[in-house]
């Protein structure tokens, strides 16, 4: 959640996807839309700020994600790839754009009506993979290379985040394919043949970079928790006078995991 005023100034410090302060807003929007709205989505952060009566909301001229912000600085274009945009606001699978019915529902909420902006006016434009997302400007080139050697004019694709990048990198963008990303957070992405028939709060409905519907299962913690456990094992060993190489320790633990049951003993996150 990165909201900006009309001068392009950031109104509040960047609120990341791990900033789980939007429980009230996420629950209310999920009920209003009959569509699961996770706490980390941009629209949940915006609505929570409204419910909290935060002063900055009245000044918002534009809000975006980190990927959208960087792209804006490089090209001057206020756009997002559809996969990244689906983590800001629900996407209509047929139009591959924001769900217009839900846009109207949001604007009609009593707490929202007092603001002069309409939601669609402050959201980035949605683009699908392959569309022109602008070119590197002189200002953008200087941000990347202060020496001035990098030339402007390079065409850029619609900006996506790590989820869209992972789908493309693993060739998991076709229907009935999927991938798992294990990093700071961990999540599974499965490309669906058709939309779900009911709301499941365990499943976040997002899209591929080309706009196909994806069911996402997301957990906030992965390697951060793992690092804590590995650190504990190292500390244990060192207390017995054993010097441990962290690379070797990680390697042994990862390889040991391969000996486990294929269903992880029934363990479910």
Predicted segments, located by residue:
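N-terminal cofactor/phosphate-binding cores enriched in small/glycine residues
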Residues: 1-2
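Carbohydrate-associated surface elements
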Residues: 19
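Active-site core segments that coordinate phosphate-bearing ligands/cofactors
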Residues: 6, 23-84, 89-116, 130-269
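Short glycine-rich, Thr/Ser-proximal phosphate-binding strand/loop in the N-terminal lobe
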Residues: 7-16
């Amino acid at each position: 959640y990165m909201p900006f005023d009309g001068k392009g100034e950031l109104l509040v410090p960047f609120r990341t996807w791990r900033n789980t302060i939007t429980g009230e807003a996420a629950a209310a929007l999920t009920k209003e839309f009959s569509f699961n709205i996770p706490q980390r989505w941009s629209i949940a952060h915006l609505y929570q700020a409204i419910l909290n009566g935060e002063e900055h909301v009245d000044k918002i001229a534009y809000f975006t994600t980190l990927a959208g912000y960087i792209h804006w600085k490089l090209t001057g274009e206020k756009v997002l790839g559809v996969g990244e945009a689906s983590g800001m606001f629900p996407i209509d699978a047929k139009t591959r754009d924001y769900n217009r019915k839900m846009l109207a529902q949001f604007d009609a909420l009593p707490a929202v009506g007092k603001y002069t902006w309409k939601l669609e006016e402050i959201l980035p434009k949605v683009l699908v993979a392959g569309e022109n997302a602008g070119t590197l400007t002189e200002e953008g080139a200087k941000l990347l290379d202060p020496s001035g050697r990098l030339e402007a004019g390079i065409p850029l694709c619609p900006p996506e985040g790590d989820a869209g990048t992972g789908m493309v990198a693993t060739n998991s963008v076709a229907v009935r394919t999927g991938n798992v990303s294990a990093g700071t957070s961990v999540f599974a992405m499965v490309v669906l043949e058709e939309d779900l028939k009911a709301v499941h709060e365990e499943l976040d409905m997002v899209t591929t970079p080309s706009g196909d519907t994806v069911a996402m299962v997301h957990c906030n913690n992965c390697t951060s928790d793992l690092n804590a456990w590995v650190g504990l094992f190292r500390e244990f060993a060192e207390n017995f006078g054993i010097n441990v190489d962290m690379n070797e320790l990680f390697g042994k633990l990862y390889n040991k995991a391969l000996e486990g049951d294929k269903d992880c003993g029934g363990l479910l996150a």
